[in-house]
Amino acid sequence: MAHRGGERDFQTSARRMGTSLLFQLSVHERELDLVFLDHSYAKPWSAHPDASSARPTRMLFVTPRRQHESTIESDVPIDVETVTSTPMPLYDNQKARSVMNECERHVIFARTDADAPPPPEDWEEHVNRTGWTMAQNKLFNKILKALQSDRLARLANEGACNEPVLRRVAVDKCARRVRQALASVSWDTKLIQWLHTTLVETLSLPMLAAYLDALQTLKGKIPTLIDRMLVSSNTKTGAAGAEALSLLLKRPWDPAVGVLSHNKPSKLPGSPLILIASSGPSSSVFPTSRRHRFWQSQLSCLGKVIPVATHLLNNGSGVGVLQCLEHMIGAVRSKVLEIHSHFPHKPIILIGWNTGALVACHVSVMEYVTAVVCLGFPLLTVDGPRGDVDDPLLDMKTPVLFVIGQNSLQCHPEAMEDFREKIRAENSLVVVGGADDNLRISKAKKKSEGLTQSMVDRCIQDEIVDFLTGVLTRAEGHMGSEPRDQDAEKKKKPRDVARRDLAFEVPERGSRPASPAAKLPASPSGSEDLSSVSSSPTSSPKTKVTTVTSAQKSSQIGSSQLLKRHVQRTEAVLTHKQAQAQFAAFLKQNMLVRKALPPGTSSCLFVPISSEPPEEGEKEDLRVQLKRHHPSSPLPGSKTSKRPKIKVSLISQGDTAGGPCAPSQGSAPEAAGGKPITMTLGQASAGAKELTGLLTTAKSSSSEGGVSASPVPSVVSSSTAPSALHTLQSRLVATSPGSSLPGATSASSLLQGLSFSLQDISSKTSGLPANPSPGPAPQATSVKLPTPMQSLGAITTGTSTIVRTIPVATTLSSLGATPGGKPTAIHQLLTNGGLAKLASSLPGLAQISNQASGLKVPTTITLTLRGQPSRITTLSPMGSGAAPSEESSSQVLPSSSQRLPPAP
């Protein structure tokens, strides 16, 4: 008795461990076998030299074998005092009993005459068999015998702790016997309709409930034959009774319906696409079974499920087995290639049953997939077991999970272990105790373990989730990021980053087929158009350079502002008030220095942020990058220079035109025949990204004063004579600090606008695409200047210098009135470095890029100040911009530019 009690306790604990995932328990609880409880010198699972890629076998509901004790005790103690606790069922007992008695509660719906008294208990003696044929008598006796066995099982299991499971097993057994009896008469329509009418009229209520349970089970398996059987009774009971009976027989009940409906499988990371390979040619005559539909609905919780059906011409007439197999493999392979073309960065998981598992393995050898799940893998073939030297499956590089039954005829667990040792790919094995080739457990196993087939299927699905979660997490770890949703990630992060990272994942796997993400060309414009991502089956994604219209740009602006909220910034950035406070202090010091300047000083001072020479490491980086003829793919987090540069452009607009015209780079037409006065400082290194922010003064009223960064780097053309610079600078500043003239913008508002734009640039750089240009980048930005202004080219700085434009209040008389005197004043203005120390008080603005996001520090920032005659000048957005034109004669920008969305 003690041995039997210990065996029962062990089975109870094993059953709880086997279904621990139904209670959301730890996975490691299931791995408590004797090896973990043995001595410390027990060999681990990876001690075998050939088992480096084979993970330990997971056992589901496998009862350990224990040898019976040979010694017979004379005195066996019997414990009559200890109360054994009732084992907790693995389902909601109350809900299971409710669905279990559903047919008994609604048995009246099946009777043709509801008002007639129910048949007595001895109904068999009252059955009139006069005129029955031999076939009718034999069929009736077979059905009656099956129903009597079910009735006895119900009475025997009544009141048991796991009565719903035992009832389910008995109903399935009765349904199988009824189906065999009906098949013995070849489902003769007249005979089965006569049988159904006779049983409904003569059976007692308990026996009729058992008969309805059997019909309910068969309706889910063979709905067409059952509908043909119920035609005669539906005409007698009427429309209401027929509808009630149809609803009752709609689906078979399951004790675990509550557990399975409330505990859905969790979604896999990366939003994978799950392809189900068919086990044979599909046919409309044989619809998918209820169990396969349950599997497909459960797998749809993990990701997008795409069944791959194989259709043969002329119903497969004249098609051999080898041709059919080649057709099946070709269908799955073409579907994989189609998905790769439409969704190149989506993980693909192949799942197959039996022969479909073999098809999935063969496709994984030829095409790139993330993982393969083989359910009921057939190891034995016509030519013998698999695993020979010439077996193509030994070349698999894709992680694979094998799920087999303990009692499988086509795959023995020990032979499967030998086969796993020969595979170089990462593989795992799950053995389902008491299951056959289709992973269906026997009735004895269901009774002993208190399980149903749906519970076993759910536990297998949990094992699949554990395996795929680990594979997908490691696959995304190779791409240099934590698990995340690829659907949202394709909007936040440019695909070229994943394209680069997949490149060093593929060589790591040897001969594994390369991911299609590594085959896509780089974007020629340095920024990827999200409109090129197409999910349509008729179009393939491709990178392209387009001229963005105003409506398209507004939609991109909205999406960029929305995505900005989801980007986590790990580095501290300047807030709005901090930037205002720093610029207020900067302005105050600027005013003190401005009062001490001589009257003839120009109204703009170019202040270098750092005047020290660049470090040796930066010079070496610059020399190496300038030697490259094409930009390489930098690793995330690397940077070419520690400090960005600012390019300053002074543009004035007047009514007079002279000199060569600068073609407009904005989408809105500007004044034709303009000539900007532009100065560029520093060099643009090859492969580096250029971050360009433009502060423009456009036509608006004095009440607007909007400040933003232009979405595209462009230089607006302007018609100038050299004398227009004085007009511009006289409008930009006030005559005295205390007075404010109408139409004049003070230095405070200009600096405040600069703070807004720089803060916006700092907060948005983490969401910008970083794609180097495939062509060679210019080593220096070339600028065309008018002849009187050639002296501006004398001012050059290193790559680590930031130059800012600071307006200083002055009068018109201090600038000189003649065009010939202006170059001298500007020369004095640019060569003056008196405010170099003053600008060093702004350390927070030197680093305006979020380096934690993986983007490089911007190398250049362009500040453009444009004045318009007879207009009130304010800081406002430039308007709708277009893609930068590379044939501009006024300013040549590097092609690897980054577009900035405007400030909200």
UniProtKB/Swiss-Prot annotation:
It comes from the Eukaryota. It is found in: Nucleus; Mitochondrion; Cytoplasm, Cytoskeleton, Spindle pole. Component of the NSL complex at least composed of KAT8/MOF, KANSL1, KANSL2, KANSL3, MCRS1, PHF20, OGT1/OGT, WDR5 and HCFC1. Residues 476-563, 608-678, 697-719, 762-782, 869-904 are annotated as: Disordered. The gene is KANSL3. InterPro entries: AB_hydrolase_fold, KANL3/Tex30_Abhydrolase, KANSL3_1st, NSL3/Tex30. It comes from Homo sapiens. Residues 512-550, 700-719, 879-904 have a biased composition (Low complexity). Non-catalytic component of the NSL histone acetyltransferase complex, a multiprotein complex that mediates histone H4 acetylation at 'Lys-5'- and 'Lys-8' (H4K5ac and H4K8ac) at transcription start sites and promotes transcription initiation. The NSL complex also acts as a regulator of gene expression in mitochondria. Within the NSL complex, KANSL3 is required to promote KAT8 association with mitochondrial DNA. Required for transcription of intraciliary transport genes in both ciliated and non-ciliated cells. The modification Phosphoserine is found at residues 523, 536, 540, 773. GO terms for cellular component: histone acetyltransferase complex; intracellular membrane-bounded organelle; mitochondrion; NSL complex; nucleoplasm. This is KAT8 regulatory NSL complex subunit 3. It holds the Pfam family KANSL3_1st.
